[in-house]
């Protein structure tokens, strides 16, 4: 059996320990490595000719990407998970206890257990390459660093910086890592090994004191000050997580106890807390999302089809969506883009939008001005169909007008090649209707982005009956290159995301008209786990946009999609939301720093906010509508699987990740329980709450999605 760790000795007394997991593109730490590492460390200790040790990766662009997450699923009990953490502690403590200098030479991803391995070394040097990132992202999986990270990181970079890294899971770039004292040096990759060897030859050095602000020096230097840091961190965490995620509080406790009672006690607490989190329902849900997205990356979206390479893209429309799509195509996919708009103003807006996003990177020193300018050079513009003939894909982002989109299809078929894909960014019009104008309907597909494009990770790839498998596969690959998570959905009004969102939003509107206040509604759903409440979301998306989509959904899908008529009064009062500074909340000069409701909205709607219902009951009424419709979408074949439905809801509308998505959450609730809740609401409020057939069948059979 091939080994993962190989020790080679140099003539100068420095040994190189190379980690290279056989048959894998990236290094990950596995439980079975423990004995192998211990054996090598024993060999090093017994060889007096070894004066120093350099730990390096044999992989091209990865140091260690973290622990193998599948190990956690093998843990049947908290005791199994605790043993896993303790095994890591034993190995890393052995490494740290070596009397010779140990240097980690880092190039590429150094994350999670990989960074904990590097922290157990006496010094660290990393490459200045863009692929090099350091971090402890375990919190994003509902976990904490279980290999000593909660103890070694605060001692190296300070409590405040360490908590920030562990509570956010952020990735640190090389220069930032040097500045914060996480690494001792940053060098070009070409001299990484040489530098690490020189550091090992120079011997162990006491770590440089971390540069801290005066406030942090004072706070971290006394037990009273440290308590202030921990208390503030706890308050911020509670506000952000609404008590829905247990990991952050446990991370704070590990650091607090380790600093107060010593490293040994800290490691004991870390192992116990890690074990509790591994078997928590929140971490299981978050890990299911991780596995789902990893699995989806291997799929083409159309079985048996291979994607064609996209060498050039055209974007029709220079508005917010068009500008955003053009921007991610050049900056993330590195694909040349031609933006076409009928007005010079639209084109200059698209260029300005892309420049502004790139310039943020320059200001944060994430890229050089030259790199920004090179990426901007990939974007060109035209008011006519010039320079579009060789486009492999055309993304249409014009107004939601069927006649206009028909004209775009005809123009593109006339101006471009026979293989050119026409992808419409429509949010509501059926793709089959857009394809009616095409002589090559197999090339027509939907590609629905969410706003703002550069931030929202999801895209819906919408296939109509005649879309070819190659068109689907090429569009999915194109979206992935843009840094997006694509889900393939079938054609139908609202597709998947807007369809499940519409009923949720409509129910929130009904509750508002029944007398629930705007703040109470929003707070109830944020407490449930959504990033923003439904009324805030309506203001952000645009009340006018909601008003355009609702009739389309009602016409195609039936009475249950009928929006409350009272909302027409908002448009009559010129309330569109944030975009025109007039909606449910105050904007502009009249708004205070804390978001305040525009109380005049109640008068416009002809209601008085009365006694607020229990927040859980408010959230339940909105959420069960979304759950029921998600199952209906599966029933109708709009989505291919519960997995796709979970990913679409989490990445498209911020469904609470700790619940795992609508389908995982239904499994947690139980189909029979959900049917009972829906039928109770149906008896009170009518047939919009009628459970779909699949749910009823599942309730009878006590079935699950996963």
UniProtKB/Swiss-Prot annotation:
Organism of origin: Shewanella baltica (strain OS185)
Q: Which family does this protein fall into?
A: In the N-terminal section; belongs to the enoyl-CoA hydratase/isomerase family. In the central section; belongs to the 3-hydroxyacyl-CoA dehydrogenase family.
Q: Which GO terms describe its biological process?
A: fatty acid beta-oxidation
Q: Give a Pfam family name.
A: 3HCDH_N
In short, the EC number is 4.2.1.17, 5.1.2.3, 1.1.1.35
Its job: Catalyzes the formation of a hydroxyacyl-CoA by addition of water on enoyl-CoA. Also exhibits 3-hydroxyacyl-CoA epimerase and 3-hydroxyacyl-CoA dehydrogenase activities.
Which catalytic reaction applies to this protein?
a (3S)-3-hydroxyacyl-CoA = a (2E)-enoyl-CoA + H2O; a 4-saturated-(3S)-3-hydroxyacyl-CoA = a (3E)-enoyl-CoA + H2O; a (3S)-3-hydroxyacyl-CoA + NAD(+) = a 3-oxoacyl-CoA + NADH + H(+); (3S)-3-hydroxybutanoyl-CoA = (3R)-3-hydroxybutanoyl-CoA
> Where are the residues of the annotated region Enoyl-CoA hydratase?
1-188
Compartmental location: Cytoplasm
Q: What is the lineage of its organism?
A: Bacteria, Pseudomonadati, Pseudomonadota, Gammaproteobacteria, Alteromonadales
User: In Gene Ontology terms, what is one molecular function of this protein?
Assistant: long-chain-3-hydroxyacyl-CoA dehydrogenase activity
Q: What is this protein called?
A: Fatty acid oxidation complex subunit alpha
Among InterPro entries, the record links this protein to: 3-OHacyl-CoA_DH_NAD-bd (IPR006176), 3HC_DH_C (IPR006108), 6-PGluconate_DH-like_C_sf (IPR008927), ClpP/crotonase-like_dom_sf (IPR029045), Enoyl-CoA_hydra/iso (IPR001753), FA_oxidation_alpha_subunit (IPR050136), FadJ (IPR012802), NAD(P)-bd_dom_sf (IPR036291)
Q: Which pathway is this protein engaged in? A: Lipid metabolism; fatty acid beta-oxidation
């Amino acid at each position: 059996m091939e080994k993962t760790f190989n020790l080679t000795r140099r003539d100068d007394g420095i040994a190189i320990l190379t980690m290279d997991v056989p048959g894998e593109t990236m290094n990950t730490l596995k439980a079975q490595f423990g004995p192998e590492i211990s054996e090598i460390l024993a060999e090093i200790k017994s060889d007096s000719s070894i004066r120093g040790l350099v730990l390096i990766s044999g992989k091209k662009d990865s140091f260690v990407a973290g622990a193998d997450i599948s190990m956690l699923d093998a843990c049947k009990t908290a005791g199994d998970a605790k043993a896993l953490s303790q095994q890591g502690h034993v190995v890393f403590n052995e490494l740290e206890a070596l009397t010779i200098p140990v240097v980690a030479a880092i190039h590429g991803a150094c994350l999670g257990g990989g960074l904990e391995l590097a922290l157990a070394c006496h010094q660290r040097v990393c490459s200045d390459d863009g692929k090099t990132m350091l971090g402890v992202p375990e919190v994003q999986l509902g976990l904490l660093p279980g290999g000593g990270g909660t103890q070694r990181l605060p001692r190296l970079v300070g409590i405040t910086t360490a908590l920030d890294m562990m509570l956010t899971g952020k990735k640190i770039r090389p220069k930032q890592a040097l500045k914060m004292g996480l690494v001792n040096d940053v060098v070009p990759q070409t001299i990484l090994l040489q530098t690490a060897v020189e550091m090992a030859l120079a011997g162990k050095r006491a770590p440089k004191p971390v540069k801290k602000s005066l406030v942090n020096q004072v706070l971290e230097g006394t037990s009273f000050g440290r308590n202030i840091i921990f208390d503030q961190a706890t308050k911020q965490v509670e506000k952000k997580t609404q008590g829905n995620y247990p990991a952050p509080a446990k991370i704070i406790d590990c650091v607090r106890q380790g600093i107060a009672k010593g490293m040994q006690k800290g490691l004991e607490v870390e192992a116990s807390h890690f074990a509790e989190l591994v078997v928590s329902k929140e971490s299981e849900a978050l890990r299911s999302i991780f596995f789902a997205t990893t699995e989806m990356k291997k799929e083409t979206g159309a079985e048996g089809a291979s994607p064609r390479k996209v060498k050039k893209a055209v974007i029709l429309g220079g508005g917010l969506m068009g500008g955003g799509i053009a921007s991610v195509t050049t900056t993330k996919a590195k694909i040349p883009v031609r933006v076409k708009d009928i007005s010079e103003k639209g084109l200059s807006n698209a260029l300005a939008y892309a420049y502004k996003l790139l310039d943020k990177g320059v200001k944060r020193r994430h890229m050089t001005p030259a790199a920004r300018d090179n990426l901007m050079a990939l974007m060109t513009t035209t008011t006519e169909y010039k320079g579009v003939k060789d486009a492999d894909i055309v993304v249409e982002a014009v107004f939601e007008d069927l006649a206009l989109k028909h004209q775009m299809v005809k123009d593109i078929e006339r101006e471009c090649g026979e293989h050119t894909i026409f992808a419409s960014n429509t949010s509501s019009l059926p793709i089959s209707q857009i394809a009616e104008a095409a002589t090559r309907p197999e090339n027509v597909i939907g590609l629905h982005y969410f706003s703002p494009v550069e931030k929202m990770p999801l895209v819906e790839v919408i296939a109509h009956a005649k879309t070819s498998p190659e068109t689907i596969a090429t569009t999915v690959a194109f979206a992935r290159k843009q840094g997006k998570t694509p889900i393939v959905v079938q054609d139908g009004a609202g597709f998947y995301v807007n369809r499940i969102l519409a009923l949720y939003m409509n129910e929130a509107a009904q509750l508002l008209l029944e007398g629930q206040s705007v703040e109470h509604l929003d707070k109830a759903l944020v407490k449930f786990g959504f990033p923003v409440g439904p009324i805030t979301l309506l203001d952000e998306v645009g009340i006018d946009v909601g008003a355009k989509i609702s009739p389309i959904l009602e016409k195609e899908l039936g009475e249950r999609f009928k929006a409350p008529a009272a909302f027409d009064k908002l448009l009559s009062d010129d309330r569109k939301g944030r975009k025109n500074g007039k909606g449910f909340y105050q904007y502009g000069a009249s708004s205070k720093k804390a978001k305040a409701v525009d109380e005049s909205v109640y008068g416009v709607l002809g209601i008085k906010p009365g006694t607020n219902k229990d927040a859980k009951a408010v959230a339940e009424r909105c959420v069960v509508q979304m759950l029921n419709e998600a199952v209906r979408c599966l029933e109708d074949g709009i989505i291919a699987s519960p997995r796709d439905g979970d990913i679409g809801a989490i990445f498209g509308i911020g469904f609470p990740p700790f619940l795992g998505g609508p389908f995982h959450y239904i499994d947690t609730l139980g189909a029979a329980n959900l049917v009972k809740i829906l039928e109770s609401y149906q008896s009170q409020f009518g047939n919009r709450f009628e459970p779909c057939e699949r749910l009823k069948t599942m309730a009878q059979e006590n079935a699950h999605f996963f």
